[in-house]
Amino acid sequence: MKKLSILGVTGSIGTQALDVIKNSNGELKLIGVTANSSVEKMIKIIEEFDPKYVGMMDKTCAGEIKEYCDKNNKSTIVLSEMKGLNKIASLEEIDIVLTSLVGMIGLEPTLEAIKAKKDIALANKETLVVAGELVMSEAKKNNVKILPVDSEHSAIYQSLRGNDLKTLNKIILTASGGPFRGKKICDLNDISVDDALNHPKWNMGRKISIDSATLMNKGLEVIEAHWLFECDYDNIQVVIHPQSIVHSMVEYCDGSIIAQLGAADMRLPIQYALNYTERKNLIAKTLDFYEVSQLTFEKPDLETFKPLKLAFKAGKQGGLMPTILNGANEAAVALFLDEKIEFLDIFNIIENCMNRFEEETKKPLTLENIIELDKKVKKYVVDMK
């Protein structure tokens, strides 16, 4: 039996991970869970899975959970705020931590889990985007596996198994193209929140759905792939693949290309990461090639979807520049979801911040500098409006 904590259990990845656990025939045991403020969802999880530890970022919500547990004679240990997240990420009795928190908030507990020598099933891409050098160094020092949960990175991970990284020639990251594939910049005026959330293939949370619409999600995945697979940015290629069947590919030095294909179901990479190194019986629909009429691939439009281009630029510059990129994007997406800015404003805000905070990138890459700069960038974006 493998014991785990899930950070961000009430979100899209977290809830799909619960489905994986339910179908694991007792081979996966949930010990700790965290959420931000979703009290009702957390109570249902406590009733069904009976985790020993529950953490809520919101202290008031943690109080509500504790009151519920006391009234119902639950022995659940309820923790709160970042201290609680860090504790649940580093519990002595767990084997692996699924980090499915959205945004920069996932960085600190992920590092705490690594220092406690817990393997990481990583769904929080921002952790590697802003601190890839720190995280991978810490993982190597503590002999910790970083197992990607993103479908694309899981595909690459599987395609690389049994092969030497030195034989890797190129990573080919596939992207669905999002809801606005084929559109030009002039077509992206007056885009509503609902338009941008309407992803054609994947069931995802609100923030990542907007990132997919701008192609920033793919940009963040490029930076993540650089750190996970020690691959130079010039050897990472993004291709638009609207069918979302080929989840990504690896080209080797001899020209051979190995791809991982499957249904567009996030439970597959979640299940693979949580059960690594074993493969378990499928809980999702399998791919039927008789129903696959075609597989097509296109070049991304970097002029229309500038966030992808900016992500390559930030990744190549390195240091603290990805922190600026990510912080500006997080703040801008939040404003767009609150209908305070237009869709195309997201693009302009990111580029503006990368230029404005250029001097900050001369500082050394430390956890303290990352956190400080992230706050500074987000405050600047919010104060703009």
Swiss-Prot record:
List the cofactors. Answer: Mg(2+); Mn(2+)
**Catalytic activity of the protein:** 2-C-methyl-D-erythritol 4-phosphate + NADP(+) = 1-deoxy-D-xylulose 5-phosphate + NADPH + H(+)
Q: Which HAMAP family match?
A: DXP_reductoisom
Amino-acid positions noted as binding NADPH in the UniProt annotation, renumbered to this chain: T10, G11, S12, I13, N124, E126, G205
Q: Which terms does the UniProt entry file under GO BP? A: isopentenyl diphosphate biosynthetic process, methylerythritol 4-phosphate pathway involved in terpenoid biosynthetic process
The EC code for this enzyme is 1.1.1.267
The protein, known as: 1-deoxy-D-xylulose 5-phosphate reductoisomerase
> Which family is this sequence assigned to?
Belongs to the DXR family.
Task: Give the matching Gene3D superfamilies.
Answer: 1.10.1740.10, NAD(P)-binding Rossmann-like Domain (3.40.50.720)
What is its pathway?
Isoprenoid biosynthesis; isopentenyl diphosphate biosynthesis via DXP pathway; isopentenyl diphosphate from 1-deoxy-D-xylulose 5-phosphate: step 1/6
Binding positions (Mn(2+)):
D150, E152, E221
Q: What does this protein do?
A: Catalyzes the NADPH-dependent rearrangement and reduction of 1-deoxy-D-xylulose-5-phosphate (DXP) to 2-C-methyl-D-erythritol 4-phosphate (MEP).
- Residues engaged in binding 1-deoxy-D-xylulose 5-phosphate: K125, S151, E152, S176, H199, S212, N217, K218, E221
Q: What class of enzyme is it?
A: oxidoreductase
Q: Name one GO molecular function term.
A: 1-deoxy-D-xylulose-5-phosphate reductoisomerase activity
Please provide the record's keywords in A-Z order: Isoprene biosynthesis, Manganese, Metal-binding, NADP, Oxidoreductase
Instruction: Identify one Pfam family in the record.
Output: DXPR_C
